[in-house]
Amino acid sequence: YEVGMMKGGIRKDRRGGRMLKHKRQREENDSRNAGALTEARSTALWPSPLMIKHSKKNSPALSLTADQMVSALLEAEPPVVYSEYDPSRPFNEASVMTLLTNLADRELVHMINWAKRVPGFVDLALHDQVHLLECAWLEILMVGLVWRSMEHPGKLLFAPNLLLDRSHGKVVEGFVEIFDMLLAASSRFRMMNVRGEEFVCLKSIILLNPGIYTYLSSTLKSVEERDHIHRVLDKITDTLMHLMAKSGLSLQQQHRRLAQLLLILSHIRHMSNKGMEHLYSMKCKNVVPLYDLLLEMLDAHRLHAPAAKGSPPSEDDPLNQLAVPSPSMHSLLPCYVNKQEEGNEQEAI
């Protein structure tokens, strides 16, 4: 044979490369099949009566005009909830906390129904719907409180029959700091003259907050879920800009107002974290018993907290006695479905 030629026309130093190529192809096929199996198992873990009716790319929410989006969000607004305030009862730490936790628990029932009506929300996996609500529920309650209190300087309108000032906040240990932050946010809303259409957009942005992506389901569909949330958030942001343009603001003023509104959301997040710590403290001190749904939400939020994920909880931590997450099903899931059914029955009545 001539130099460089071998019998069969295949050089030994090339044969190994071809074998590695075939090996890589087999590994890629095995990985693809394993991913499909994992996805199928994940879907089986979450049997849901709330079936996803549309693919993410064909979601009706993404085809809505700005005016249609505003109309949908306004129609989704929950009903007014009254407190169980009794003027004959004295105002003390226990009575105030009982009033507020009872009110929050009943508002949470309506919040679930509201979230289901936010365009694009039900197109997410049920597991991710639950996670988003678990992480944002107190922020949603607080931004609603701030909005209701706009016309009451120096006071917070928790319900139509429950208007509290700073002196009432001092009754509860550690609550006055949160009370002052809520008053400051309400004052900011009033100064900016936030309108109802802008408020419902902000509340929906809180629900779909991109900072919560780390808590979404770890499946092959998670990327699609995140992309869908991005698209819905873009749609809501465009709706906000449309509202500002209709009000006659220049483009520069629109951008400035949008930035100011979104900056308030970081303040709402900070208040929510403070409120969660305070509520958990009240729970540990047995100041007031927490209702089922409120307790589930509190436990779930703490289980998702970055601090809780970063280090294992201590055996002495009261959190261990409050809730134990299920390895296959989230503890809030049955409550999530049941509360929605209860809300639907109340609306039918």
UniProtKB/Swiss-Prot annotation:
Residues 1-5 bind DNA. Pfam families: ESR1_C, Hormone_recep. Residues 12-24 have a biased composition (Basic residues). It is found in: Nucleus. Keywords: DNA-binding, Lipid-binding, Metal-binding, Nucleus, Receptor, Steroid-binding, Transcription, Transcription regulation, Zinc, Zinc-finger. InterPro entries: NHR-like_dom_sf (IPR035500), Nucl_hrmn_rcpt_lig-bd (IPR000536), Nuclear_hormone_rcpt_NR3 (IPR050200), Nuclear_hrmn_rcpt (IPR001723), Oestrogen-typ_rcpt_final_C_dom (IPR024736). Residues 65-301 form the NR LBD domain. The keyword DNA-binding applies. GO terms for biological process: cellular response to estrogen stimulus; estrogen receptor signaling pathway; regulation of transcription by RNA polymerase II. GO terms for molecular function: estrogen response element binding; nuclear receptor activity; steroid binding; zinc ion binding. GO terms for cellular component: chromatin; nucleus. Composed of three domains: a modulating N-terminal domain, a DNA-binding domain and a C-terminal ligand-binding domain. Belongs to the nuclear hormone receptor family. NR3 subfamily. The steroid hormones and their receptors are involved in the regulation of eukaryotic gene expression and affect cellular proliferation and differentiation in target tissues. Binds DNA as a homodimer. Can form a heterodimer with ER-beta. This is Estrogen receptor. The gene is ESR1.
